[in-house]
Amino acid sequence: MLKKQDLIGIIVKQMSKVICDMQSNVDVEEAVVKKEYFSQVASLPVRENYSLELVKTIYTKTQYPSNRGGFEKDFMMYVDADCEVERFVKINERRHNFVNFQYINENGLIRHYFPDFMVKTADEVYIVETKACRDLNNYDVNAKKKGALNYVNRINKLKADDRMNSVWHYCIVDDRTFYEKQELSASVKDILIYCELTNNNTSDEFFNY
């Protein structure tokens, strides 16, 4: 017999799934698109010792994590130097609170996920999460991925001028793949396409509610 606490947990998980499924199945053709822009946030606080002056982002300086932030720093520098990249932004979840997706965490609760970057090329937008290779099979990483992919699929059903006349993508760039491809002088777009193909599977084994 299930304990009361276990039963409540099951109900919460099922309700969370129903709510997320309902939102994912909204008819996009009838959607009212509210556009918000990164430029609405005029500036971001940064720590001087852990920030970069970059060309292709709207902010004078962009911060990277002080603790184990080397991968993000290297990724930003590589993106900034790539001729196919028109612009990109490092998402700050406190200031860019309009860039988030819902997902169901391991406890069955609905949470908001803020990805790391948005990268714009001529006719594509990439929502990018940078992640250590060892974390790719983490439950929450895969739950966030599922939520982001649902969002991207809905975005791509909108009229072209409501999605920046671009096809939208979501991909997780892991550190091992990034450094391997960087060593081969791969373009940022090639890296993103490769990671989208290899890291975007969402196995149902993670989501047995």
Annotated model-derived regions:
Residues 1-209:
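Electrostatic, structured charged patches in enzyme active sites and in nucleic-acid/phosphate-binding
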